[in-house]
């Protein structure tokens, strides 16, 4: 590990991870055999090249969705063109582990970023491991219609196999160029995969916490800025691009405000008494500099604000409304990255109700659920450049396929929700791939292309359907917690070309 970090970050030498020599576990041998049998077009060996489809079958809803279409949902008239690529990470299957270790499944948990200068989208995947884990930033090249994994993060950090590591990038990767940098950088933080936190022997192995890192988009080098808060790791992070402040939220509500330009900590630690930052939401109003989230302390239903100029927190003078259907507390969950021309952030609550937040007036309005069926949990949203449309998914935790793995568009002008495409069962029947759920929806600068990383699996649908029998989807508390029927293990990118007639502003 590196004890001394340069003021401007340490450039990490390129290192390739060594191939594993251990034999696969029996369960992994079986999983590999099923995946290779289901992979009808050898996409696992395609090295990230996309296949392209445009089919009216994208617009065919499953029976359970068809029942609610006339009342709550519509389906697009024109099928989109979709590029589909399996992400080509190494070490796809795992050996038998000894001792207190865990690994798998390969999965993607962070948001996505678009870099218009190179027409590339970025996201992340990892193997959820504790020791000798694998974590990659993912790059999708629109011109080449292909996806690749950038060098493995733990290897770049020179973590040894016997040292606890990290296998998630769980927040927003953001592009920002500091005054001392010649090029644009992609900024992010790392996150552990043992919950609620590593054990004492994990820390004793040499692990100290989550890192701040960046990727030089011109030189293609990674930089490490070290661990800003010992024994904290970062399930959520964002960058205020106007002020150069990187925000991180820890597992236990630790709050990080780190000045990229000065390489200085503004705040690192817990909030004042009876305040706890919700670690799955961070609205940054770049016009005012204020940041917002829910207060996760106790039964509080307040929203809290952080002012970086005053370095102070405060509660807003109103409560977040309870969910209308379930009469329970909810938080703001997915949301647009910035306020739009209407002055509003838009998003969905933890149970899928549409909300808008006005940072100037500090007012919140909560409306109806946009997805009328169960599993309305959504963690990703983007807004069209003209502001009329919101794009989002549902059943994000790997369980969208019972509903057709829909890609949704909400029209803020007409107050209607439209399904642009059902990814399931089309990709299962043609390619053997079950599209589970996505944590990353990102539009290009024109709002014409929608990039998504989906968690999914090359598996027999009967296996997952059997696991789903005991799942109670009527209990909303189950929507965001792991279930045996979640489709994980083989991450893929989908790039959807939205037909012009389906996105008129």
Sequence positions of predicted segments:
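Surface-exposed loop and turn segments in beta-propeller and other repeat-based domains
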Residues: 82-101, 150-171, 226-231, 270-275, ...
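Beta-strand-rich domains and repeat architectures in extracellular enzymes and scaffolds
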Residues: 88-135
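Repeated scaffold domains used in trafficking and secretory/extracellular systems
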Residues: 107-111, 157-178, 231-239, 274-286, ...
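Residue-level detector of Asp-centered blade-edge/turn motifs that repeat once per structural unit
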Residues: 114-118, 181-183, 240-243, 285-288, ...
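Short, solvent-exposed loop/turn segments at conserved positions within beta-propeller repeat blades
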Residues: 129-134, 196-209, 251, 296-300, ...
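Short loop/turn segments that connect beta-strands within beta-propeller blades
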Residues: 141-144, 216-220, 259-263, 307-311, ...
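Loop/turn-rich, solvent-exposed surfaces of beta-rich toroidal or solenoidal domains
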Residues: 373-412, 418, 422-426, 431-440
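Blade-level signature of beta-propeller repeat domains, shared across WD40, Kelch, NHL, RCC1
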Residues: 432-505
């Amino acid at each position: 590990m590196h004890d001394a970090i340069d003021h401007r970050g340490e450039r990490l030498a390129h290192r390739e991870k060594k191939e594993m020599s251990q034999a696969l576990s029996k369960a992994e041998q079986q999983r590999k055999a099923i995946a290779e049998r289901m992979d009808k077009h050898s996409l696992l060996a395609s090295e990230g090249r996309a296949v392209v489809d445009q089919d009216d079958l994208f617009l065919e809803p499953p029976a359970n969705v068809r029942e609610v279409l006339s009342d709550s949902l519509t389906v697009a008239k024109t099928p989109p063109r979709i590029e589909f690529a399996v992400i080509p990470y190494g070490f796809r299957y795992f050996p038998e582990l000894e001792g207190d270790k865990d690994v798998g499944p390969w999965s993607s948990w962070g948001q996505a970023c678009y870099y218009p200068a190179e027409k590339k989208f970025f996201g992340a995947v990892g193997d959820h491991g504790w020791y000798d884990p694998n974590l990659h930033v993912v790059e999708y090249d629109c011109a080449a219609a292909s996806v690749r994994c950038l060098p493995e993060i733990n290897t770049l950090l020179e973590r040894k196999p016997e040292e606890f590591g990290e296998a998630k990038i769980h927040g927003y990767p953001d592009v920002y160029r500091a005054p001392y940098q010649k090029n644009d950088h992609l900024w992010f933080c790392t996150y552990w995969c043992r919950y609620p936190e590593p054990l004492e022997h994990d820390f004793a192995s040499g692990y100290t916490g989550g890192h701040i890192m960046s990727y030089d988009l011109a030189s293609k080098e990674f930089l490490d800025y070290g661990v800003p808060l010992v024994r904290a790791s970062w399930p959520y992070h964002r960058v205020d691009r106007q002020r150069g402040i990187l925000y991180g939220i820890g597992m236990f509500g630790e709050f990080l405000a780190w000045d990229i330009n000065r390489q200085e900590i503004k705040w690192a630690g817990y909030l004042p008494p009876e305040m706890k930052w919700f670690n799955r939401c961070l609205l940054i109003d770049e016009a005012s500099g204020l940041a917002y989230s829910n207060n996760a302390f106790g039964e509080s239903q307040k929203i809290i604000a952080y002012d970086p100029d005053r370095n102070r927190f405060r509660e807003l003078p109103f409560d977040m409304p309870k969910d209308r259907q379930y009469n329970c507390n909810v938080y703001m969950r997915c949301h647009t990255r910035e306020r739009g021309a209407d002055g509003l952030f838009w998003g969905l609550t933890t149970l899928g109700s549409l909300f808008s937040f006005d940072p100037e007036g500090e007012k919140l309005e909560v409306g109806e659920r946009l997805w009328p069926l169960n599993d309305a949990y959504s963690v990703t949203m983007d807004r069209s450049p003209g502001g009329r449309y919101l794009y989002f998914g549902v059943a994000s935790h790997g369980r969208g396929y019972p509903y057709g793995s829909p890609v949704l568009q909400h029209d803020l002008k007409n107050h209607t929700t439209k399904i642009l495409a059902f990814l399931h069962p089309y990709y299962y029947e043609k390619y053997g791939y079950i599209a589970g759920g996505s944590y990353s929806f990102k539009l290009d600068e024109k709002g014409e292309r929608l990039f998504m990383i989906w968690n999914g699996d090359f598996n027999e649908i009967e296996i997952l359907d059997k696991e789903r029998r005991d799942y109670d989807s009527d209990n909303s508390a189950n929507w965001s917690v792991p279930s045996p029927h979640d489709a994980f293990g083989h991450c893929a990118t989908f790039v959807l070309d939205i037909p012009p007639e389906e996105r008129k502003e």
